[in-house]
């Protein structure tokens, strides 16, 4: 009887320790916002993906940076992509707006800036085009790109492809007029 009781106590202790570690990790997870996300493009003009937690592989981050760099050089669109675990208040829309306002993403005259925020553990994202892009990149196109590139790849657990395919689709949109993705099926 005492041996069974001792094993149960060990199992209960192990379960309690496991649950405590999960809650501790969640409590210490950083809530990212426009103030504490390092803006890599301010230190290196060839970098556009803000990935302070190193969620993406270096090679895929470089490939994504290359597409965004081409977007700026060929179409005059400055873009900032952010990928983090959590954003403040679970609100990527607010974080994207705050980044655009705080750092002035895009040319001041044309307002052709773009901020994309992906918060993996919050399971949320937002594509925020500047006012100067809204005629060229509609809300419907932003939603199609987000669902086909970000949501689809995040469901597969592939943040690298979520960011790279988004950069490719947006680059294609401004280079050819088409995103190169099929519009997601309704329903």
Please name every model-derived segment.
Residues 23-28:
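Hydrophobic membrane-targeting alpha-helices
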Residues 9-11:
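Classical eukaryotic N-terminal signal peptides for Sec-dependent ER targeting/secretion
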Residues 4-7:
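Short, positively charged and aromatic/hydrophobic N-terminal segments
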Residues 29-187:
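Folded, non-transmembrane soluble domains that reside on the lumenal/extracytoplasmic side of membranes
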Residues 14-22:
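Bacterial N-terminal signal peptides
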């Amino acid at each position: 009887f005492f041996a069974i009781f001792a094993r149960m106590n060990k199992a209960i202790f192990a379960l309690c320790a496991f649950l405590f570690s999960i809650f501790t990790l969640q409590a210490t997870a950083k809530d990212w916002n426009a103030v504490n996300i390092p803006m890599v493009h301010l230190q290196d003009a060839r970098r556009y993906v803000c990935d302070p937690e190193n969620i993406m592989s270096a090679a895929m981050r470089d490939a994504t940076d290359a597409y965004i760099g081409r977007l700026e050089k060929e179409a005059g669109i400055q873009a900032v992509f952010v990928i983090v675990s959590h954003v403040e208040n679970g609100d990527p829309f607010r974080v994207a707006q705050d980044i655009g306002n705080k750092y002035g993403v895009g040319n001041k005259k044309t307002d052709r800036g773009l901020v994309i925020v992906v918060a993996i553990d919050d399971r949320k994202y937002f594509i925020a085009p500047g006012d100067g892009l809204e005629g060229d990149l509609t809300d419907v196109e932003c939603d199609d790109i987000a669902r086909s590139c970000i949501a689809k790849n995040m469901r597969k657990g592939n943040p690298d492809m979520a960011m790279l395919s988004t950069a490719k689709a947006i680059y294609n949109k401004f280079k050819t007029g088409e995103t190169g993705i099929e519009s997601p099926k309704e329903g």
